[in-house]
From Swiss-Prot:
Species of origin: Chlamydia abortus (strain DSM 27085 / S26/3)
Organism classification: Bacteria, Pseudomonadati, Chlamydiota, Chlamydiia, Chlamydiales
Protein function: Catalyzes the base-exchange of a guanine (G) residue with the queuine precursor 7-aminomethyl-7-deazaguanine (PreQ1) at position 34 (anticodon wobble position) in tRNAs with GU(N) anticodons (tRNA-Asp, -Asn, -His and -Tyr). Catalysis occurs through a double-displacement mechanism. The nucleophile active site attacks the C1' of nucleotide 34 to detach the guanine base from the RNA, forming a covalent enzyme-RNA intermediate. The proton acceptor active site deprotonates the incoming PreQ1, allowing a nucleophilic attack on the C1' of the ribose to form the product.
Protein name: Queuine tRNA-ribosyltransferase
Active site, UniProt feature: 89 (proton acceptor), 281 (nucleophile)
Enzymatic class: transferase
Length: 372
C-alpha cells in the first residue's frame, strides 16, 4: 500500500505538527529522526529494531552487491532482516556529492568540485559516472534509479535529481533545476506503472533563490507524489538554511509529509522543526560517535578530553540506552577511544542513536502541548 499520512496535532504556536505515517512495514511517528544506514547497516550498531524509519543509499547498494542481487534474495527488508519501514534515495546525491563534497561540507552543497571527479557526463538522459569500487563506467537515469529502488523494495523512494554545489553559475543552476524536474516526472511515471507498496516523495530544488523554491513547490504540488522532500543547496550555514526551509515549507500544502534531505543535526532540527518538517535524515549521531562526540541531556561530551580520565559517572544519568544501563563510565569510554578499541564507537553509537530517538520523542511531546 502507498503510505497514509495523518496529522494528529497541529501546534498553535508554529507550523510544527505531530503526525503518523502508515506504511506496509509499519508506523512512523513524526516528527522523526531517520538514521542513515549507507550500505544497509547502521555503523557501529547491530540492533535497529527500535528505529522506526531507516535511510539506505541506493548508490552504494547498486555498486555492491547490486540491487538485482538483493531483489533475487527477496528485497532489502529480507536481505538485512528488517521488518520496519525503509526509505531509499535515488543514488544521485552520492554521485554528485562524491564529485562536489558532502552535505556537511556546506550544510548542503557549497563544496568545490574535486580534482578527480567521479562524474563523467551529465545529459538530459541521465548521468554517467565511475564506480568508487573499481572505476567501471556506470549510468543512472530516472528509470534506472527507480527500478533499482523497486529491486530494493523500500517503502519510500526518491526520484532522480541533480545536486549542484553552492557556487554554480546562474545559467547552469537554472538549467539544472529544469532538468531535475524532467527527471522527477520521468521517475514518477515509471513508478506509477508498478507502484507496489511503495510511495514516492517529490524533491524540491531551487537553491537559496526563493523564486526557484516556489517553482519547485508548485511542481511537486501539481504531481501525485505521496510526500515532499526538501533538497538541493540550502546555503553555506545554518543562518542561510533557516529562511530557505521556512519559505519552502510555507508554499507546501499540509496534507502530505515533508522530509528534509540530509539534514539531521541537533541545531538544524531545533531551528527548522517549527516550519512543519516531519522527518530528518542524517549520519550525524553515528559519525559523531565514531569521533568521540557523545550527545547528552547535559550537552555534548568530547570524551577524549582529559577531564574525563577518572570520571566514573555514567555518560548520561538520564539515559536508558544499553550503554548507560550497562554502567559504561565516561572514564572507561575515554580509555576505549584512546586505545582505539572498536567497542568504543559501538558503545557511543548505541547511545547517540538512542539519544536522538528520545530527543524526537520529547519534541513530539512539546508540539502536543503547543510549546513549539
Amino acid at each position: 500500500m502507498a503510505l497514509k499520512f495523518h496529522v494528529l496535532h497541529q501546534s498553535k504556536k508554529s507550523r510544527a505538527r505531530v503526525g503518523r505515517i502508515e506504511t506496509a512495514h509499519g508506523i512512523i511517528d513524526t516528527p522523526a529522526f531517520v538514521p542513515v544506514a549507507t550500505n544497509g547497516a547502521l555503523k557501529g550498531v547491530v540492533d535497529h529494531s527500535n528505529i522506526q524509519l531507516m535511510f539506505c543509499n541506493t548508490y552504494h547498494l547498486l555498486v555492491h552487491p547490486g540491487t538485482e542481487a538483493i531483489a533475487a534474495m527477496g528485497g532489502l527488508h529480507k536481505f538485512i532482516h528488517r521488518n520496519s519501514p525503509i526509505i531509499t534515495d535515488s543514488g544521485g546525491f552520492q554521485i554528485f556529492s562524491l564529485a562536489y563534497g558532502s552535505v556537511a561540507e556546506e550544510i548542503k552543497s557549497c563544496g568545490k568540485k574535486k580534482g578527480s571527479s567521479s562524474i563523467l557526463e551529465v545529459t538530459d538522459e541521465g548521468v554517467w559516472f565511475k564506480s568508487y569500487r573499481d572505476g567501471s563506467k556506470l549510468f543512472l537515469s530516472p528509470e534506472v534509479s527507480v527500478q533499482a529502488q523497486k529491486d530494493l523494495g523500500a517503502d519510500i523512494i526518491i526520484p532522480l535529481d541533480e545536486l549542484l554545489p553552492f557556487h554554480s553559475d546562474t545559467t547552469y543552476f537554472l538549467s539544472s533545476c529544469a532538468r531535475t524536474y524532467v527527471w522527477e516526472k520521468r521517475s514518477l511515471d515509471y513508478h506509477k506503472k508498478d507502484p507496489r507498496h511503495q510511495s514516492m516523495y517529490g524533491v524540491i530544488h531551487g537553491g537559496i533563490d526563493p523564486k526557484q523554491r516556489k517553482i519547485g513547490c508548485a511542481f511537486v504540488e501539481d504531481h501525485p507524489f505521496d510526500g515532499f522532500a526538501i533538497g538541493g543547496s540550502l546555503g553555506r550555514n545554518l543562518n542561510e538554511m533557516v529562511p530557505i526551509v521556512d519559505i519552502t515549507t510555507s508554499y507546501l500544502s499540509k496534507d502530505r509529509p515533508v522530509h528534509l534531505l540530509g539534514i539531521g543535526d541537533l541545531p538544524s532540527i531545533q531551528a527548522t522543526i517549527g516550519f512543519g518538517i516531519d522527518s530528518f535524515d542524517s549520519s550525524y549521531p553515528t559519525k559523531a560517535a565514531r569521533h568521540g562526540l557523545i550527545l547528552s541531556s547535559q550537552g555534548p561530551i568530547k570524551i577524549a578530553n582529559q577531564a574525563y580520565t577518572n570520571d566514573l559517572s555514567p555518560i548520561d544519568p538520564e539515559c536508558t540506552c544499553l550503554t548507560c544501563t550497562s554502567k559504561i563510565s565516561r572514564a572507561y569510554l575515554r580509555h576505549l577511544f584512546k586505545v582505539h578499541e572498536p567497542n568504543a564507537s559501538i558503545w557511543a553509537s548505541i547511545h547517540n542513536l538512542h539519544y536522538m530517538q528520545e530527543f524526537m520523542k520529547n519534541i513530539r511531546e512539546q508540539i502536543l502541548h503547543d510549546r513549539i
